[in-house]
């Protein structure tokens, strides 16, 4: 009886544009081919087949289309070869792969703003994207303004079980470098701040261009979020600094507005792209 390819020998890599996953595995001598399946395992209890299930491959590689921020698992099983009286492998090798950005820190619960005060971004991470995970289904609050300044930060919940965030008082997220909030349910009923998202009142001097604007070249965005009870602005540049924002985005979001004022307000700034 043959064995399936060893998981340690399987290589998985993204195409340059990130749209396809290329999976290669070592040859199993005497094999009559391989059975390949790729699963989306964001919800491990309910895997979703990507492409052809149990595709028979006469070779040692397979390609599947993939998406960002997704967990996958490849299953590869060696098939038998009657010519050599080799029987197929009884089980498949299972190899996990994720297109999620690596986690730098995890907040288990509680006040996100207080946690960030107690756990500042490490000096060796300044200038790099810093990803903070929230635990799926857990409840959090933001009790004060969080100004990330010139640090590019992503706060990320779970795609299949959103983190629950309650914005309280002067709570808001400000940045001059780019900020993403992903996969969270955000309740703004108790938020008194002028905006949920905004630009920092202290710009990054190195980002200033000849026109006098300060360029925010990385996205400011919500992705996969449900925002409820929003009685203030969704985005506001705080009317302090003249920014040029390359991209302001709201991807796969539901936003409940409880006001008829301007939702996105760039008083001094310009926004190149918004969707």
Each model region followed by its residue ranges:
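N-terminal extracellular ligand-recognition/capping segment immediately after the signal peptide
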Residues: 108-153, 158-170
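Right-handed parallel beta-helix
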Residues: 178-190, 216-231, 243-262, 268-275
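Pro/Thr/Ser/Gly-rich low-complexity, intrinsically disordered linker/stalk tracts
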Residues: 1-30, 68, 83-100
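Extracellular low-complexity, O-glycosylation-prone stalks/linkers
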Residues: 28-52
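Extracellular beta-strand-rich solenoid/capping regions of secreted or surface-exposed proteins
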Residues: 18, 139-154, 164-217
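Right-handed parallel beta-helix/beta-solenoid
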Residues: 43-52, 88-121
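Beta-strand-rich modules
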Residues: 62-86
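Short glycine/acidic-rich loop motifs that flank beta-strands on beta-rich extracellular proteins
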Residues: 83-84, 143-144, 166-171, 189-197, ...
């Amino acid at each position: 009886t043959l064995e399936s390819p060893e998981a340690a020998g399987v290589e998985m890599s993204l195409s340059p544009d990130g749209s396809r996953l290329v999976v290669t595995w070592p040859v199993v001598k005497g094999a009559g081919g391989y059975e390949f399946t790729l699963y989306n395992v964001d919800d491990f209890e309910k895997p979703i087949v990507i492409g052809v299930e149990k595709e028979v491959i006469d070779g040692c590689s397979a390609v599947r289309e993939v998406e960002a921020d997704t967990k996958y698992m490849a299953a590869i099983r060696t098939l038998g070869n009657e010519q050599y009286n080799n029987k197929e492998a009884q089980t498949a090798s299972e190899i996990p792969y994720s297109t999620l950005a690596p986690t730098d820190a995890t907040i288990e619960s509680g006040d996100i703003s207080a946690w960030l005060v107690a756990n500042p971004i490490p000096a060796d991470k300044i200038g790099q994207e810093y990803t903070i995970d929230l635990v799926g289904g857990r409840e959090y609050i933001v009790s004060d303004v969080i100004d990330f300044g010139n640090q590019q930060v992503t706060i990320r919940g779970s795609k299949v079980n959103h983190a629950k965030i309650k914005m309280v008082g002067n709570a808001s997220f400000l940045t001059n470098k780019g900020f993403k909030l992903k996969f969270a349910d955000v309740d703004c009923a108790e938020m008194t701040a002028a905006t949920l998202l905004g630009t920092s009142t202290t710009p990054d001097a190195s980002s200033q261009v000849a026109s006098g604007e300060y360029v925010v070249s990385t996205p400011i965005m919500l992705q996969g979020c449900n925002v409820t009870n929003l009685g203030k602005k969704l985005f506001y540049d705080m009317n302090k600094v003249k920014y040029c924002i390359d991209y302001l985005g709201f991807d796969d979001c539901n936003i409940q507005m409880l006001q008829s004022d301007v939702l996105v307000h760039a008083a001094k700034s310009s926004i190149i792209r918004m969707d």
